[in-house]
Amino acid sequence: MAPRTTRKDQFLERVVGINRVSKVGRRFSFTALVVVGDGDGTVGVGYGKAKEVPAAIQKAVEEAKKSFFRVPRVGSTIPHLVQGEDAAGVVLLRPASPGTAVIAGGPVRAVLECAGIHDVLSKSMGSVNAINIVRGTVEGLKKLKSPQAVAARRGKALDEIAPHAMLRTMENDRAQKSAKAGA
């Protein structure tokens, strides 16, 4: 099933998967796994169940909006290598140079694109269950630390711990944000 992407109230919604379960005979129940983000570093994941598909998606979207969290980014990628795990699903996320794009499977791609990460390499290992992979990706993204936070924690200057290319990217991001704010 192709992922459905919609934009409501400036949020990007991606339906990762819909499952149909029959309880008794022809009584069906649907579950939906949805990722919601603003495309600028905020993302959340939700899981909804209902007797109709649209109701399940709506419940999942509401749950996803309640579980928003911030993802530190450097330019269009992540600051460092990270691994997230959930159940038997393991997701490895690696920063990539600009122009690489998102190299990831469907569930991981949905989370990263909704978070506004455009250049990253990923590898999913273990479980192929979409729920485990999405939760593993979220767990990995929650482990990310910004270069400023790492420098403050170590008691060092930012230029002592961050590569020069990363510092240039961060300066360019600040300049672009101030230009947008001034326009």
From Swiss-Prot:
Example GO BP: translation
Superkingdom to which the source organism belongs: Bacteria
Residue ranges of every copy of the S5 DRBM domain listed in the record: 11-71
Pfam families: Ribosomal_S5, Ribosomal_S5_C
Record keywords, A-Z: Ribonucleoprotein, Ribosomal protein, RNA-binding, rRNA-binding
One annotated Gene Ontology cellular component of this protein: small ribosomal subunit
Cysteines engaged in disulfide bonds, as pairs: none
InterPro entries per UniProt: Ribosomal_Su5_D2-typ_SF, Ribosomal_uS5, Ribosomal_uS5_bac-type, Ribosomal_uS5_C, Ribosomal_uS5_N, Ribosomal_uS5_N_CS, Ribsml_uS5_D2-typ_fold_subgr
Entry GO MF terms: rRNA binding; structural constituent of ribosome
Subunit architecture: Part of the 30S ribosomal subunit. Contacts proteins S4 and S8.
Family membership noted in the UniProt record: Belongs to the universal ribosomal protein uS5 family.
Domain notes: The N-terminal domain interacts with the head of the 30S subunit; the C-terminal domain interacts with the body and contacts protein S4. The interaction surface between S4 and S5 is involved in control of translational fidelity.
Main function: With S4 and S12 plays an important role in translational accuracy.
Protein's name in the database: Small ribosomal subunit protein uS5
Gene from which this protein is expressed: rpsE
